[in-house]
Amino acid sequence: MAENVTIARPYADAAFELARGAGALGPWSEALDRLAAVAADSSMRACINDPKLSADQLNTLVQEVGGNLTAEQQNFVRVLVDNERLQVLPEIRDLFVALKNEHEGVLEAEIASAFPLDDAALAALKADLEARFQARLNVTVSIDPELIGGVRIAVGDEVIDASVRGKLANMAAALKN
């Protein structure tokens, strides 16, 4: 995985600079989402690794399956095909999104809850977190019954554990000391 990220970084940087310069961060993000899904598909991975397919055939296949691409995006796919880097498209997409979020002042937040959160509770929690981190947040919510109650929030490298399980673990550690 780390090797793929290293390989993907210059491609993500180039795509980001091209998209930012054209004022097309949104369309590029959408195109990379589609292309990453194509590259992650098991049948497409078999095609990518098939030595019988020429670069032109693979390029045509990816562009047809990848949806409506601009000329710059088609050239980007061609560069990836020519350099045998299609397999790192998911990492390119992830790095591109991170660069886009940094540029737009957006942080990724993962909220794990013991129970489903209603819209009002989620909106209030998101507003509190945005005030605390002084940034807009892209929130991903998951359900983790092992938390027993409460929530565990991860924003960047900071984790806020307000779960019953976390509090019990802290109490157990305090009793051992």
Curated annotation (Swiss-Prot):
It is found in: Cell inner membrane. GO terms for molecular function: proton-transporting ATP synthase activity, rotational mechanism. Belongs to the ATPase delta chain family. F-type ATPases have 2 components, F(1) - the catalytic core - and F(0) - the membrane proton channel. F(1) has five subunits: alpha(3), beta(3), gamma(1), delta(1), epsilon(1). F(0) has three main subunits: a(1), b(2) and c(10-14). The alpha and beta chains form an alternating ring which encloses part of the gamma chain. F(1) is attached to F(0) by a central stalk formed by the gamma and epsilon chains, while a peripheral stalk is formed by the delta and b chains. It is a peripheral membrane protein. Keywords: ATP synthesis, Cell inner membrane, Cell membrane, CF(1), Hydrogen ion transport, Ion transport, Membrane, Transport. HAMAP family: ATP_synth_delta_bact. It comes from Azoarcus sp. (strain BH72). The lineage of its organism: Bacteria, Pseudomonadati, Pseudomonadota, Betaproteobacteria, Rhodocyclales. GO terms for cellular component: plasma membrane; proton-transporting ATP synthase complex. F(1)F(0) ATP synthase produces ATP from ADP in the presence of a proton or sodium gradient. F-type ATPases consist of two structural domains, F(1) containing the extramembraneous catalytic core and F(0) containing the membrane proton channel, linked together by a central stalk and a peripheral stalk. During catalysis, ATP synthesis in the catalytic domain of F(1) is coupled via a rotary mechanism of the central stalk subunits to proton translocation. This protein is part of the stalk that links CF(0) to CF(1). It either transmits conformational changes from CF(0) to CF(1) or is implicated in proton conduction. This is ATP synthase subunit delta. Pfam families: OSCP.
